[in-house]
Curated annotation (Swiss-Prot):
Originating organism: Mycobacterium leprae (strain TN)
Cellular localisation: Cytoplasm
Keyword Manganese recorded: no
Gene3D superfamilies: 1.10.286.20, DNA helicase RuvA subunit, C-terminal domain, Elongation factor Ts, dimerisation domain
Name the UniProt record assigns to this protein: Elongation factor Ts
Amino acid sequence: MANFTVADVKRLRALTGAGMLDCKSVLVETDGNFDKAVESLRIKGAKDVGKRAERATAEGLVAAKDGALIELNCETDFVAKNAEFQKLANQIVGVVAAAKIVDVDALKGASVGDKTVEQAIAELAAKIGEKLKLRRAAIFNGTVATYLHKRAADLPPAVGVLVEYGAGTDAANSTAAAHAAALQIAALKARFLSRDDVPEDVLASERRIAEETAKAAGKPEQSLPKIVEGRLNGFFKDSVLLEQPSVFDNKKTVKVLLDEAGVTVTRFVRFEVGQA
């Protein structure tokens, strides 16, 4: 008896872009293990794996204040442009900045004006007629560069980045370098600060995919270590902030430009509306 359902096949197809028969076949091969099925399709070359996993139907905005960042979701971009919706988001991020609360459940119980955050969201949702959701929050307490990006001029910011950093001796250069790093993260979607921050399970998965892809392409066994190393270096270049080529000078990495300004990035966070 199959350890998966038709819904699993459809979900795998939506996630990977692979054909229905391929999805069914790989679920049979993996005995219904969804994660292994996704990895198997990546090895076989299915398109857009992982990218669709990050997508969601949610609209909304990100808001920032004093080192704090939130994502507030709604159902349509029409509501995202609503002045009351944007006002509520700014009030909530003000609560995060003042009370240093990032746990969403705890934040819902915090006060905003004469009501809780949860009550304020529920009241506006009833008035507007759409489901509203406070999705996540973050705050950094050190020196922070903030960048907000709009997808369109008539929409509120949909991408928000916080970069916590140690400044160099030249304050102006440090501020500019940190802001550039924030813009870099917004544009190229770095996932990790350095190689040391990449979880071992992620590295293991990337190694396995690189090796299996090379084998499937008929590469000789003795060449596999070099091929895997090359693919891992490509992964680091794409996913690790300090190893990415700068969007301002692609002959230099982000690390080189930060070092030139005497800036040390300690951590960052990136929120994008509707994405993981």
